[in-house]
Each structure stands twice: as structure tokens, then as C-alpha cells.
Regions:
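A short hydrophobic beta-strand segment most commonly corresponding to one strand
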Residues: 59, 78, 107, 122-141
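Short glycine/proline-enriched turns and hinge-like loops at secondary-structure junctions
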Residues: 53-54, 72, 100, 119-121
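Short, charged/polar surface micro-motifs in flexible loops or helix N-caps
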Residues: 48-52, 61-65, 83-87, 136
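Conserved metal-binding segment of the jelly-roll/cupin
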Residues: 90, 100-120, 130-132
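A short beta-strand-loop-beta hairpin characteristic of the jelly-roll/cupin
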Residues: 66, 74-102
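Conserved short histidine dyad/triad with adjacent acidic residue
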Residues: 40, 44, 57-73, 110
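A short, N-terminal "cap"/entry segment at the start of jelly-roll beta-barrel domains
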Residues: 1-53, 68-69, 140-155
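Short strand-connecting beta-turns/loops that link adjacent beta-strands
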Residues: 49, 74, 93, 121-122
Length: 155
């Protein structure tokens, strides 16, 4: 475990103002870059909460819907599935696919072209997203997607 800098301590910062922040559900904002097919809301970011290293928010995808292909540049992403089943395609031609359900985490490396799909035709897919930088970055892509992606499983 690393030693905190000498400046860290009860007298070093205004912990009341710079400490824990709660962002209520009603305070999340849809004013964030998103990919066609998803409803993304930001909760934690540099501009909203002063975060220096992380971005966090939620994502909803309607039943039967899918996002466009995209990547998040140098940012890594963690996706936690809250409700529904997510299909994730990835690769230069979206040639790989996997499935994740409630309680599952997905790690999306930096620069990875990917696409989220809702596996259900009826139920909405709900996820929590965390990125390795304080602001959202979305680069939408036009890819010639593979017709039959290869299934990858970690079971």
C-alpha cells in the first residue's frame, strides 16, 4: 500500500466541500455524447463533480435495439449489467460476440471498436458505466460488420 502525500490529512483540504459527493438519480444528465441507439446519462465527471480520473453514468437500451459501432479512444470502460441481457460485439469488423447478464461486469479496453445490443426484444437493458477519464469520449464508427460473429465465452 502506498504512503499518502504529506499534504493529505485533516487540515490539508476542505473535506466538507471536497469530500464525498452524492449525485441523486434525478440529477443525472443526458447532456453527454452518446451513440445512436442508447440513452446515456452522466452522474460523475470532471465538469459536473470535479472528478479528476473517472467518469460514471448509466446506459439504457430499449428492447431489440442496438448501438452503432464506436470506441472511447484512450479510455478504458467497465460496464456493470443491472437489468436485462447485453450482447457485446467487438473487433475491427465486430467479429466477436459475448453475452452478459445481471451482476456481470464487462471490461472494454481502450480503442476497442464495439457495439452493445439488447438481447431481449421486449425488456430494456440497464447498465452502469465507469470510464478511466473524467470526461466522456465517444468516437462513432462506420464498420463493415461480420455477418456471423464468433461467440466468445468465459464460463
Amino acid at each position: 500500500m502506498s504512503t499518502p502525500p504529506a499534504s493529505v490529512g485533516p487540515d490539508s483540504r476542505d473535506w466538507r466541500r471536497e469530500g464525498i459527493r452524492v449525485v441523486r438519480a434525478k440529477r443525472r444528465s443526458g447532456d453527454t455524447p452518446a451513440t445512436l441507439g442508447m440513452n446515456r446519462e452522466v452522474a460523475i465527471s470532471g465538469s459536473r463533480t470535479g472528478s479528476r480520473l473517472l467518469w460514471a453514468g448509466t446506459n439504457r437500451i430499449e428492447g431489440g435495439a442496438k448501438t452503432g459501432a464506436h470506441h472511447h479512444g484512450e479510455l478504458e470502460s467497465i460496464i456493470y449489467v443491472v437489468h436485462g441481457e447485453a450482447l457485446m460485439r467487438w473487433g475491427d469488423r465486430l467479429e466477436f460476440i459475448t453475452k452478459a447478464g445481471p451482476g456481470d461486469f464487462l471490461h472494454v479496453p481502450a480503442w476497442l471498436p464495439h457495439q452493445e445490443l439488447n438481447a431481449s426484444a421486449e425488456d430494456e437493458l440497464h447498465c452502469v458505466l465507469v470510464r478511466s477519464g473524467p470526461e466522456e469520449l465517444v468516437v462513432n464508427l462506420e464498420l463493415d460488420a461480420a455477418a456471423e460473429p464468433e461467440w466468445i465465452s468465459w464460463d
